Amino acid sequence: MEFPKAVIKRPNYHFEYPHKRKYKRIGRGFSVGELEKAGLNINKARKLGIFVDIRRKSVHEENVETLKKFSEQLSNQKP
């Protein structure tokens, strides 16, 4: 089973045009707020092998949905 990856916005650079900032990149891990919305805590997520980035403050809904789907897959897989 493949572990989920967090998707975050690229940083804003002052020398770029605004239309180039809409791309997203793979982040270091999920934020604490995303974990709480998905019903997980930091310790449980780390035991499951999910990377946690405690420095991030943003909450992206697509990451919350990814975490919910992943936890459903784990609950269905375990006997």
Curated annotation (Swiss-Prot):
One of its GO terms (biological process) is translation. The keyword Ribosomal protein applies. One of its GO terms (molecular function) is structural constituent of ribosome. GO terms for cellular component: ribonucleoprotein complex; ribosome. It comes from the Archaea. Keywords: Ribonucleoprotein, Ribosomal protein. Disulfide bonds: none annotated. Pfam families: Ribosomal_L13e. HAMAP family: Ribosomal_eL13 (MF_00499). NCBIfam families: PRK12277.1. Belongs to the eukaryotic ribosomal protein eL13 family. This is Large ribosomal subunit protein eL13. It comes from Saccharolobus solfataricus (strain ATCC 35092 / DSM 1617 / JCM 11322 / P2) (Sulfolobus solfataricus).
